[in-house]
Amino acid sequence: MNILIADSGSTKTDWSLIDGQGQVVMTCKTQGINPIHMQDAEVLQILKSELILPESPQEVYFYGSGVTEAMKPRMNSLLQQAFPGAKVEAEGDMIGAARALFGNKPGIACILGTGANSCLYDGTKIVMNTPPLGYILGDEGSGAVLGKLFLNGIFKGSLPSAIKKRFLKWSGLDYPGIINKVYREPLANRFLASICPFISEQIAEGEKYENGSDKLNEAMALYRVVLSNFHAFYENNLIPYIQYVKASQEDISQLEPGMKAWDSSLGEGIPMIGFVGSIAHYFEAPLRNVMEDEHHLHVVKIMRAPMEGLIAFHTK
């Protein structure tokens, strides 16, 4: 029995075809599929024309950022049209991250990429989700917000001038060009997130130098910006889950009226936590500093992409 798994964002979709022995037969990429922003014909064109498979799948599991509860029936219908006779299931990217990280065990699942999202997962379903709100109102921990903090630092002077000079050379932009990218051109969030490789490179390069050197001091200044981004993610997104679990275990009267308590059979204490996404992957050290060293959470996995975990989940 062949299984087809998709992990889709707005820009690209990663596909893996798995055979009956659990082996990966084929992997490929197509355009991103987001049913919120795309017409049926556009989605079907990608599924039927861009996705070329050596064999027909019997099961199709699609995880995407645009697959809300309201969009699930429509996405399932499109998958059924593209793969007649196959069992199909469309889910959001958050449940995909949770399954990839924890399988059927409970945990706090987090996505840290261009944007940020998180949820409390009971091993089957999402129990609680702090709304991410996007990079203007929220998205703490994301690449877009890290880029925003970085630009604020270089232009307002909280980061060393040498970093600003190197960044302007690296990006080929000046102050008016950056303002234009952020406020006048589309997809400002992607532009802001595109700054993160520079930040990562500068930290890695600076850490090669001895204590007291300018390069190391500059790297540590950038490291503190990354830490502040992850602190904000913890405080604004993770604390609600922790408070909910603690109230369920210690005093259910603290729960909001009508809220069901966290299932005591899922274990004592705060559930384990895991992360998916490029920002979590490339900034693993500061992420662990904040989550493990400062807040004493049990970080079990940090994955750049969820596909490996999804394959394990669907072939177990």
Please tell me what each predicted stretch does.
Residues 1-59, 78, 82, 101-108, ...:
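ATP-binding/phosphotransfer module of carbohydrate and carboxylate kinases, centering on a glycine-rich
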Residues 9, 16, 65, 95, ...:
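Anionic group-transfer/hydrolysis microenvironments
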Residues 31, 63, 119, 131, ...:
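Residues in well-ordered beta-strands of folded domains
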Residues 61-68:
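Polybasic, low-complexity association/targeting segments
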Residues 68-165:
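Phosphate-binding/catalytic loop of phosphoryl-transfer enzymes
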